[in-house]
């Protein structure tokens, strides 16, 4: 947009082009991997940081961004501390906001019995994006990546997509 240009610079429609690092046309890469999970319980939190780090190593990307998202509407990917008391607090908090029973509480449950799981996923989020620097995830000291399952005991997938150079 012309209004977004810096003073003294002019926007020429059609002049913007995607650029790759270094101008050699081959600097930007992308990598895609699916992680599959099947939990033993209906609701479960699983630390997937090591699996995501393995995807990053396999990608060979040193600088960029990593997207990790749950590919199912009743599961979540989020970042937090790996502490069992905190996980119990999540469970209590989410159950207070969207209790599993009675199933009649949710209009959605006329078709299925997982209306609560849809709400829990909405609260905890679909994905995380993490900066990649020097081939490492830029996570804080206690930050870990988690898969949150709210309607489990069946096979579900998480997508890891990495872009960078």
Regions found by a protein language model. Give the residues of each.
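Active-site histidine-anchored catalytic micro-motif
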Residues: 1-165
């Amino acid at each position: 947009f012309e209004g977004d240009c810096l003073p003294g610079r002019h926007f020429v429609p059609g002049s913007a082009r995607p650029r790759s690092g270094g101008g050699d046309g081959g600097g930007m890469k992308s990598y895609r991997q699916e992680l599959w999970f099947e939990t033993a319980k209906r609701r479960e939190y699983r630390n997937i940081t090591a699996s995501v780090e393995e995807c990053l190593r396999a990608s060979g990307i040193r600088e960029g961004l990593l997207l990790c998202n749950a590919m199912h509407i009743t599961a979540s990917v989020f970042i937090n501390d790996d502490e069992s008391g905190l996980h119990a607090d999540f469970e209590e908090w989410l159950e207070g906001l969207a209790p599993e029973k009675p199933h009649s509480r949710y209009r959605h449950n006329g078709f299925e019995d997982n209306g609560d799981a849809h709400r829990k996923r909405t609260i905890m989020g679909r994905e995380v994006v993490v900066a990649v620097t020097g081939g490492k995830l830029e996570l804080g000291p206690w930050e870990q990546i988690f898969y949150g399952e709210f309607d489990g005991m069946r096979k579900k997938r998480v997508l890891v997509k990495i872009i960078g150079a």
